[in-house]
From Swiss-Prot:
Gene that encodes it: hemC
Gene Ontology MF, one: hydroxymethylbilane synthase activity
Domain of life the protein comes from: Bacteria
Keyword Transferase in annotation: yes
Alphabetized PANTHER family for the sequence: PORPHOBILINOGEN DEAMINASE
Cofactor note: Binds 1 dipyrromethane group covalently.
Protein name (Swiss-Prot/TrEMBL): Porphobilinogen deaminase
GO biological process: protoporphyrinogen IX biosynthetic process
Metabolic or biological pathway: Porphyrin-containing compound metabolism; protoporphyrin-IX biosynthesis; coproporphyrinogen-III from 5-aminolevulinate: step 2/4
Organism, as annotated: Shewanella woodyi (strain ATCC 51908 / MS32)
Length: 309
């Protein structure tokens, strides 16, 4: 492989391609002589669209094929939404870079209603996320939650066709696809705690590829890494994948990190939540400590029931 070429493995969805193009542009900005090529491919999570994500099973539904491409030296790096990245990596691969975070909030999208609180009794809300389901149901047990799969455009099309009264999407994805005008209202972290890593883009590569790691270095964003490390540490200690009713969100003010986390029963009948505060340099320890507290309050019972289903 030429020293002046980097090949990016990416999913084919519009949002994944945006993320890959973003990394491509950043690399070309820092390294004007570099040639960056995209290698688009489909993953299991893209192909199986008729089954709720939580039932497709397995961790890494959206990343495995990209990792195989790197291990087979067909690609040098893979670009991921951090919320889709498993906690464990195949031998020889690792998460090298976490880029600056976009808006981590969820977005409420509807053609007829302004917010979740305005939805009439029995309204149909579309989301494929157990995390979103448990928090919506806890606040509004009268609503009907129905599964929603496909890329952002497909999901918006289903809303516009009248299949749903409202849908919940990640704000970052809508902003990146220049669809911010479709956001009816933002859902605060207090109303719906985001997924760990939501809104952040991560770059995976071969752990022994020093050339590529040096080229990627300028794309690292230190504050985002501390936040995501805390969130992922909590998720990892809970043994959560990306399709579990777990929310985690870290904020940093003056080097102090505040991490909020929750585990919820998908039917909304029980939400276990807590908060940890400490130095940002203790991000991983704070995440583990918060997970331990949630487990001590009964989170394991909820998660075991989800995995059995």
């Amino acid at each position: 492989m030429s020293q002046n070429v980097i090949r990016i493995a990416t999913r084919k969805s519009p949002l994944a391609l945006w993320q890959a193009e973003f990394v491509k542009a950043e690399l070309e900005k820092f390294h004007p002589d570099l040639t960056v090529e995209l290698l688009p491919m489909s993953t299991k999570g893209d192909i199986i669209l008729d089954t709720p994500l939580a039932k497709v099973g397995g961790k890494g539904l959206f990343v495995k094929e990209l990792e195989v491409a790197m291990l087979e030296n067909r690609a040098d790096i893979a670009v991921h939404s951090m919320k889709d990245v498993p906690v464990d990596f195949p031998e020889g691969l690792g998460l090298e870079i976490i880029c600056e975070r976009e808006d981590p909030r969820d977005a409420f999208v509807s053609n007829n209603y302004k917010s979740i609180s305005e939805l009439p009794k029995g309204a149909v809300v579309g989301t494929s996320s157990l995390r979103r389901q448990c928090q919506i149901r806890a606040a509004r047990p009268d609503l009907q939650i129905r599964d929603l799969r496909g890329n952002v455009g497909t999901r918006l099309g289903k809303l516009d066709a009248g299949t749903y009264d409202a849908i919940i999407l990640a704000a970052a994805g809508l902003k990146r696809l220049k669809l911010e005008e479709r956001i009816t209202s933002f859902i605060s972290a207090e109303e719906s705690l985001p997924a760990n890593g939501q809104g952040a883009v991560g770059i995976e590569c071969r752990t022994d590829d020093e050339r590529v790691k040096a080229l990627l270095a300028p794309l690292e964003h230190a504050e985002t890494r501390f936040r995501v490390i805390a969130e992922r540490a909590m998720n990892t200690h809970l043994e959560g994948g990306c399709q579990v009713p777990i929310g985690a969100y870290a904020e940093i003010v003056d080097d102090t990190l505040t991490l909020r986390g929750l585990v919820g029963n998908p039917d909304g009948t029980q939400i276990i939540a807590s908060t940890k505060v400490g130095p940002k340099t203790d991000a991983k320890a704070l995440g583990i400590s918060l997970a331990e507290e949630l487990l001590s309050k009964g989170a394991k019972t909820i998660l075991d029931a989800v995995y059995i289903k």
